[in-house]
């Protein structure tokens, strides 16, 4: 059955969301490979899974539909064309050589779709293939080397695709460790019965090509509503990516303006939503560094000829106030003294998921910031994050809204 897919804001009633429960991919994380796979530490996978279940159930108890990425991927593999396409793109002849790649694809094609989905996100080692598959490539690798690397960052479903008004951007990811995630989402949006044939726009990123420097990640994209989109230019999202998305939004008349803000290029400010989220009509949670007066900010609008008009803004807050038609933005800054605020920002105190105006989900460990939310009239539904938080992502990072009301 075709579902409605529309995201009209950051704060309207959330109705449907895609999550990814930690699985095999996190079990593959080790101290020697976690940096390459963009994690700072290894997690207790069982405990992270329990924490994620509490997160998912918190959403369900609020009447929100929760779809799990592994389920969607498993169901997508029931479509022969989708299965063939995924095997061809994820098991590349150019990576493994044509004969070995063919043998691996043939073997994978025979397993259950649940197991295949598990490997498409969790990776595959040489030790897991049958001894009957013989090849020079096998002979020259250690049994614990990866044929297909794991995708532990699938946990952060926000980044790989983002719904903006009546369409979706299927994002070309900046780091090699995440680029294969996009193919899993391309397949789901092309072939899964929930999405196939749906009347939604694919703004950007659906083609399996090299996007070079035009990278974009959903953690940098805030659909602030009223025809406006706020995008952070971070260590992951480039001005080139912003321009492609803005042009598509204007071409399809889905947005009237895109506000682009330059972010510091460091790990603690990986995406805009690690330092800023929209939690009520006039209220944002922020780490103060991002709203300094000297931060570069532009508003992009259509130039009337298929291009972009760029206007330098005096401040980010002024640009947001104009876009939303409000007199003054209310800011709730990260709580505690300077040391506590830095610690809580690192632990995703600002990375909350708004369920409806003034109601958010966030990690219970951020006691100083949660206290500030409470005093400001914002209700926090707390979830544990001692293990999940080690991945440097909070409730917003771990969720991809599929249906949300406008404002």
UniProtKB/Swiss-Prot annotation:
Catalytic site: 397 (amidino-cysteine intermediate)
Stored Pfam families: ADI
Cross-referenced HAMAP family: Arg_deiminase
UniProt xrefs under InterPro entries: Arg_deiminase (IPR003876)
Gene Ontology MF, one: arginine deiminase activity
Organismal lineage: Bacteria, Pseudomonadati, Pseudomonadota, Gammaproteobacteria, Enterobacterales
Reaction equations catalysed: L-arginine + H2O = L-citrulline + NH4(+)
Family, similarity comment: Belongs to the arginine deiminase family.
Associated pathway: Amino-acid degradation; L-arginine degradation via ADI pathway; carbamoyl phosphate from L-arginine: step 1/2
One GO CC term on file: cytoplasm
Organism for this UniProt entry: Escherichia coli O81 (strain ED1a)
Alphabetically ordered keywords of this record: Arginine metabolism, Cytoplasm, Hydrolase
E.C. code: 3.5.3.6
Subcellular location: Cytoplasm
Protein name per the record: Arginine deiminase
Keyword rRNA-binding: no
GO-annotated biological processes: arginine catabolic process to ornithine; arginine deiminase pathway
UniProt key word Transmembrane helix: no
Gene3D superfamilies given in the database record: Arginine deiminase, L-arginine/glycine Amidinotransferase, Chain A
């Amino acid at each position: 059955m075709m579902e409605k897919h529309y995201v009209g804001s950051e704060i309207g009633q959330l109705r449907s969301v895609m999550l990814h429960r930690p699985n095999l991919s996190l079990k593959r994380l080790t101290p020697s490979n976690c940096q390459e796979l963009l994690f700072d530490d290894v997690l207790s996978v069982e405990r992270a899974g329990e924490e994620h279940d509490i997160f998912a159930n918190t959403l369900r108890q609020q009447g929100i539909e929760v779809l799990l990425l592994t389920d969607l991927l498993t169901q997508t593999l029931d479509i022969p064309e989708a299965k063939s396409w995924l095997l061809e793109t994820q098991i590349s002849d150019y990576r493994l050589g044509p004969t070995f790649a063919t043998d691996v694809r043939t073997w994978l094609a025979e397993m259950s779709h649940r197991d295949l989905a598990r490997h498409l996100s969790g990776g595959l080692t040489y030790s897991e293939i049958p001894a009957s598959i013989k090849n020079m490539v096998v002979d020259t690798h250690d049994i614990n080397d990866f044929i297909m690397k794991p995708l532990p960052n699938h946990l952060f479903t926000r980044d790989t695709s983002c719904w903006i008004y009546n369409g979706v951007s299927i994002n070309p990811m900046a780091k090699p460790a995440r680029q294969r995630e996009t193919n899993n989402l391309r397949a789901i949006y092309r072939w899964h019965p929930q999405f196939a044939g749906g009347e939604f726009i694919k703004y950007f990123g659906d083609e399996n090509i090299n996007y070079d420097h035009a990278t974009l990640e959903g953690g940098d994209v805030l659909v602030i509503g009223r025809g406006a989109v706020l995008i952070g230019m971070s260590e992951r999202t480039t001005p080139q990516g912003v321009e492609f998305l803005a042009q598509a939004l204007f071409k399809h008349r889905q947005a009237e303006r895109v506000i682009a803000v330059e972010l510091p290029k460091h790990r603690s400010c990986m995406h805009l939503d690690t330092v800023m989220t929209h939690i009520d009509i006039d209220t944002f949670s922020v780490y103060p560094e991002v709203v300094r007066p000297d931060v570069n900010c532009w508003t992009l609008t259509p130039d009337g000829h298929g291009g972009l008009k760029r206007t330098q803004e005096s401040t980010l807050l002024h640009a947001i106030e104009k876009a939303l038609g409000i007199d003054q933005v209310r800011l709730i800054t990260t709580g505690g003294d300077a040391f506590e605020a830095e610690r809580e920002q690192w632990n995703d105190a600002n990375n909350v998921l708004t369920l409806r105006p003034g109601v958010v989900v966030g990690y219970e460990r951020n006691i100083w910031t949660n206290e500030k939310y409470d005093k400001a009239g914002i209700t926090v539904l707390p979830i544990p994050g001692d293990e999940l938080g080690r991945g440097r992502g909070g409730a917003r990072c771990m969720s991809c809204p599929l249906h949300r009301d406008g404002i």
